[in-house]
């Protein structure tokens, strides 16, 4: 009625420390690994409770808890982390404003110095958990640089505004406004962190962005696969299971493909995070890939389940997830931004072995250093050209990246190229995990599909490069990709059977998702090979 979680649910979440998964045990938290956090959010999201999943994921992603652990002063940690762990305080973080969304650098919420105090005028919106938050992190510009502040809800002049209504999902989201006075003690991390807020945000966002929303996207894909596969096996039309119809097998194969990619890449990325990696390009890539693939899977599952998918009610498995996917696509870095700017456009400068040094040498007007790193850059290009001729696709990506740099400063504005290079990078990462799996038909089908996606991305890039660079990329691309692999109806039928018939793949998904109610009934029919039991009989229960 209030579009909110019930009081017993809130009580359960606080008592069982769902908001403290990332907080160390020493401060009363659970100290969970990235993999454990991912599994918890996946399980919740797979039940279709997207509002609950978002409520749990936000305090464990970018917010006061994560920032306090990395940058907070010892008094700040001692004061707030135990209260966040116990649920006594609910956190939120205010970054988005009226004129800044994906581009946080356009932030207009600013502070004026008044003696030893800061007079802050703020107008934040779209802030998850703001309506109920007790501890609020704020991104504010001080002397043109972003600084992070911590304030409590009852701070004089702070106004928690009305709630937003994000796609009708029951999670708290709203505005933060007001004119308030703050001291240096309110700076997260103390005075030494004044003006360093942007760096703090980028470093902390990398980990949470690779866990929370990808868990939601992966859950969406896996539930879509299990539900549509079980339904297609059970549902009969024209005297046969619809899963045996060629027209239905095509979307079923698409669903199986997206779920297979998401499930296996999630395992790979969580392993990287567990090893201490937190690269922003990798997290941006995985966020946009996992949520986009989850959306594709849900859309196709809605088509397969047809009337059963569009009638809302407690037995509808997909509707809530379907309606909420735009939330996953949008928050923590909109997918368009993540794909076209952040992954390759931002990642190339950070990851290239010579580019940063070359740019620094130009800016500092150091001729000797410039010539040295230019030589290294040329050597890097020639070396990867040679390796690419031996069908090394990682070398092909590195060589093509250097060819993109022939565009000069224009490469960062060439978002068409940048987005396709991001896709290629994504596919290389995903293939590195999938190629290591035991060989079976689903693995082979998935690699064929990824092969075709990668081939098309290279074709798009080479056409937009300067003439010589484009021809060189086309040459080594043809060595690596002789042709597009045809996906036949028989291939689709084989892939679809991985979710309509008993398989190790489905068994894996069943261990990762929540199975109850209507989905439980469908899975029971699937497991027991009960073709004769129609979906209408399941509905009647």
Language model features: what each stretch is:
Residues 4-11, 15, 72-82, 87, ...:
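Gly/Pro-rich turn-and-neighbor structural signature
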Residues 15-78, 82, 86, 127-132, ...:
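Internal helix-loop-helix
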Residues 117, 121-161:
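A short core secondary-structure module
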Residues 132-135, 159-179, 184:
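Catalytic nucleotidyl-transfer cores of nucleotide-processing enzymes
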Residues 157, 176-209, 226-243, 265-267, ...:
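A glycine-rich, basic-preceded beta-loop-alpha segment at the flavin cofactor/substrate interface
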Residues 259-289, 301-310, 408, 429-473:
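C-terminal helix-coil-helix/basic helical segment that borders enzyme active sites and/or dimer interfaces
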Residues 309-390, 471-540:
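Glycine-rich phosphate/cofactor-binding loops in nucleotide/flavin-utilizing enzymes
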Residues 393-394, 414-431:
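C-terminal substrate/ligand-recognition segments
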